[in-house]
Amino acid sequence: MTKLAVVGATGLVGTKMLETLNRKNIPFDELVLFSSARSAGQEVEFQGKTYTVQELTDARASEHFDYVLMSAGGGTSEHFAPLFEKAGAIVIDNSSQWRMAEDIDLIVPEVNEPTFTRGIIANPNCSTIQSVVPLKVLQDAYGLKRVAYTTYQAVSGSGMKGKKDLAEGINGKAPEAYPHPIYNNVLPRSEEHTSELQS
């Protein structure tokens, strides 16, 4: 019996995860949807059933799940992914938390296979995923010495708050997700900056 959890199920990426699970008809026997306390109690329709979104707690993360899809931010992932892992789950995390960790696989399925040195798998951000798939083809065919790559990220990368800032910024409302108005603007960040000024 396959038990699957989606963490951040009411967020922008979490809802897309559910859409993809449905569209690809991914098999599982039990589904549990988690969110923050703020969104707990919401109801989500999925494959003809109504699921009540539950608050993610240490106790719930210590239950056995086979697979956990996480998209709830780096802090949530840092705290809860190891708990899910310790309880036996394979955790696929969409946050930036584990991307630079040496003992965590950073996976794009079309490019590399997981080694499963740990039960946590990180995925790169969206622009990296889209670039490495064709770059892998070029690398295999011709070899690459260097790639210079610049991206401009959508506000949706900041989740619902980022989209809200853009929509409400048109009318001059002060931003919540960004330090400056994003409407008619470009900001050099997509998340919080690290000490190396990466985001």
Regions found by a protein language model. Give the residues of each.
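Short glycine-/aliphatic-rich beta-strand segments at the starts of folded cytosolic domains
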Residues: 182-191
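Conserved small/polar residues in nucleotide/adenosyl-binding loops
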Residues: 192-199
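Anionic group-transfer/hydrolysis microenvironments
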Residues: 95-96, 187, 198
